[in-house]
């Protein structure tokens, strides 16, 4: 089965480069790629699980819309050419987006006109509204709306029209403006101005509350993310673990899932989560509190620097979920020397993951599974469990 996209057929949008390929073929191609990448590793004790499949449409919980056109007729989508406003493509009917976004787009287009949010013109470096960012929580259908603006000039007008907007769209629970003054291809700036009392969305995966905040990373395919975290939980729940680290922990998805399962058998389990982004650590702390988990410590630090400076308190399990570049040679070598009993490695880049695993000479690859987090593209997530030889 293939997904038919009119924007791809007319070459207006080429983001989903594999969308014309049958889904089974996409999965098979990704599995072959993964097997090719890990070929240099010892697989004598490796157990493969079948790829975790995604829905093929309506799976994406986030919409990042470039705003162009005229204030009375805004276009929400992409610019094929940053310097040519006439190259705008309206993607409000994108097949990837959650159905919850569909009724929102026309109301937002009307709101842009009412509030006088002139779309930013890259070529002329004029205008105010650069992007509209939407994020949906599947837990209660709540939505976060963010306006990315060049300046604070239009903030009073947004406030003036906000009550009408919320009346039409009561599902908008978090609304903010992000100020990005630079004339550069940068999505967001440092300053966030909230128009609502609430500043986070609550999501729930496997009955564990997770929180989404502006400027924080959260997986864009919640169905597959829930499967990924749930699988990690199942893999570790019966392991002899008393202390675990969750490095590059983000909002705490992996660590909280694992700690909750482990603490049900041993309440003295200790979790330390490390992430450089303060907003993510704030969300992770909220989750731990709402879960009622004890002996949990989340810190806003560089994950590699934290690990490399630990002389004592060796963990039994280390979870790593690094960015595409991987954990890097120094951290991989440190873990190899420290020798925790188990390492759970989640990666969005099998090439860098394999480089890291080759440094872990004291470890045996035990389990592996591909998660199709990004359908219709060549990208995927992979989860592996390693045990000390």
Curated annotation (Swiss-Prot):
This enzyme's EC code(s): 2.1.1.189
Coiled coil: none
Binding site for [4Fe-4S] cluster: 5, 13, 16, 94
SUPFAM superfamilies, A to Z: S-adenosyl-L-methionine-dependent methyltransferases
Active-site residues, as the UniProt record annotates them: 348
Reaction catalysis annotation: uridine(747) in 23S rRNA + S-adenosyl-L-methionine = 5-methyluridine(747) in 23S rRNA + S-adenosyl-L-homocysteine + H(+)
Molecular functions (GO terms): 4 iron, 4 sulfur cluster binding; iron ion binding; rRNA (uridine-C5-)-methyltransferase activity
Binding positions for S-adenosyl-L-methionine per the UniProt entry: 219, 248, 275, 321
One BP term from GO: rRNA base methylation
Keywords: 4Fe-4S, Iron, Iron-sulfur, Metal-binding, Methyltransferase, rRNA processing, S-adenosyl-L-methionine, Transferase
Described purpose of this protein according to its UniProt entry: Catalyzes the formation of 5-methyl-uridine at position 747 (m5U747) in 23S rRNA.
Matches recorded under PANTHER family: RNA M5U METHYLTRANSFERASE (PTHR11061), TRNA (URACIL(54)-C(5))-METHYLTRANSFERASE (PTHR11061:SF30)
Family to which this protein belongs: Belongs to the class I-like SAM-binding methyltransferase superfamily. RNA M5U methyltransferase family. RlmC subfamily.
Protein name (database record): 23S rRNA (uracil(747)-C(5))-methyltransferase RlmC
Native source organism of the sequence: Mannheimia succiniciproducens (strain KCTC 0769BP / MBEL55E)
Phylogenetic lineage: Bacteria, Pseudomonadati, Pseudomonadota, Gammaproteobacteria, Pasteurellales
């Amino acid at each position: 089965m293939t997904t038919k996209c009119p924007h791809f057929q007319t070459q207006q949008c080429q983001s989903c480069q594999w969308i014309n390929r049958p889904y089974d073929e996409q999965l098979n191609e990704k599995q072959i790629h993964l097997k090719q990448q890990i070929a240099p590793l010892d697989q004598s004790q490796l157990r493969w699980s079948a790829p975790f499949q995604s829905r093929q449409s309506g799976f994406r919980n986030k919409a990042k819309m470039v705003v162009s056109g005229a204030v009375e007729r805004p276009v929400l989508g992409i610019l094929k050419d940053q310097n040519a406003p006439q190259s705008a493509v309206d993607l409000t009917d994108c097949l990837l987006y959650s159905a919850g976004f569909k009724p929102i787009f026309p109301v937002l287009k009307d709101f842009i006109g009412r509030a006088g949010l002139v779309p930013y013109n890259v070529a002329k470096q004029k205008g105010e509204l650069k992007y509209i960012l939407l994020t949906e929580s599947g837990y209660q259908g709540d939505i976060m709306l963010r306006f990315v603006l060049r300046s604070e000039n239009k903030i009073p007008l947004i406030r003036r029209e906000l009550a009408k907007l919320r009346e039409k769209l009561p599902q908008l629970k978090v609304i903010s403006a992000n100020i990005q003054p630079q004339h550069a291809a940068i999505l967001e700036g440092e300053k966030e101005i909230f128009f609502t009392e609430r500043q986070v969305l609550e999501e729930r995966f496997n009955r564990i509350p997770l929180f989404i905040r502006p400027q924080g990373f959260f997986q864009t395919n919640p169905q597959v993310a829930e499967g990924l975290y749930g699988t990690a939980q199942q893999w570790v729940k019966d392991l002899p673990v008393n202390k675990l680290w969750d490095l590059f922990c983000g909002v705490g998805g992996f660590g909280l899932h694992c700690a909750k399962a482990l603490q049900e058998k041993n309440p003295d389990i200790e979790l330390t989560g490390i992430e450089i982004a303060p907003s993510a650590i704030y969300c992770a702390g909220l989750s731990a509190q709402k879960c009622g988990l004890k002996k949990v410590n989340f810190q806003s630090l560089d994950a590699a620097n934290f690990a490399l400076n630990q002389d004592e308190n060796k963990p039994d399990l280390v979870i790593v979920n690094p960015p595409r570049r991987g954990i890097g040679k120094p951290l991989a070598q440190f873990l190899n020397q420290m020798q925790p009993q188990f390492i759970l490695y989640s990666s969005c880049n099998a090439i860098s993951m394999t480089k890291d695993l080759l440094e872990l000479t004291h470890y045996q690859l035990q389990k592996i599974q591909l998660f199709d987090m990004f359908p219709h593209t060549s990208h995927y997530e992979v989860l592996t469990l390693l045990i000390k030889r």
